[in-house]
Design a protein with these regions (language model features):
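Extracellular Ig-like/FN3 beta-sandwich strand-entry sites
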Residues: 119-123
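C-terminal segment of N-terminal export signals and the immediately downstream linker at the start
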Residues: 23-54
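Beta-strand signatures of extracellular beta-sandwich domains
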Residues: 85-89
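An anionic, turn-rich surface loop/hairpin at beta-sheet edges
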Residues: 94-117
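Short acidic/polar inter-strand loop motif in beta-rich domains
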Residues: 131-137
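N-terminal secretory signal peptides and thylakoid transit peptides that target proteins
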Residues: 1-20
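Short edge beta-strand/loop segments characteristic of extracellular beta-sandwich folds
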Residues: 68-76
Length: 151
């Protein structure tokens, strides 16, 4: 049996690390594309304007199994103009659609709280739709130390 030299062993190890990083990177890009597709389906391909949305998430989530999330939209809630739906999408989970909240003018305020599961460090994208067909968006990154979706 032939032994590997130290140089050859290091080269093989570096190659394995490179392949695993490339594989992870391709998976991350695929998840981000799926998230973008989910947003495009929600908006019907219309552009969303930055602003009006506040996302409250911890900067670092020690456990991805239960991450507190509060979403609020600074918009009128009148019969003529109100936030009707808010979509929350994760760019790093196996299934990007996290939750969709539905509101009416009787809601009084477009705000919701929940707990979400996150597989790894990732961006959370929130898109709000108004009754007039306008869309607003915001993004926030969360660092996850222990994944909650099998990660």
């Amino acid at each position: 049996m032939r032994q590997l030299s130290r140089r050859a062993a290091l080269a093989v190890g570096a190659g394995a690390v490179t392949l695993s990083v490339v594989g992870w990177s391709q998976g991350a890009h695929a998840a981000a594309k799926e998230a973008a597709d989910e947003v495009a389906k929600f908006t019907g391909g219309k552009a969303a304007t930055q602003g009006k949305i506040t996302i409250e998430l911890p900067e670092i989530a020690e456990n991805g199994n239960t991450v507190p999330l509060t979403v609020s939209v600074d918009a009128p809630m009148t019969a003529e103009n109100y936030v009707s739906d808010v979509l929350v999408v994760s760019e790093g989970n196996p299934n990007p659609g996290v939750v969709t909240f539905h509101f009416t003018p009787l809601s009084g305020k477009a705000e919701a709280q929940t707990r979400i599961r996150l597989a790894a460090t990732q961006n959370i994208v929130v898109v709000a739709k108004t009754s007039k067909g306008e869309f607003y968006t915001a993004l926030k990154q969360v660092k996850v130390t222990i994944g909650g979706c099998g990660g």
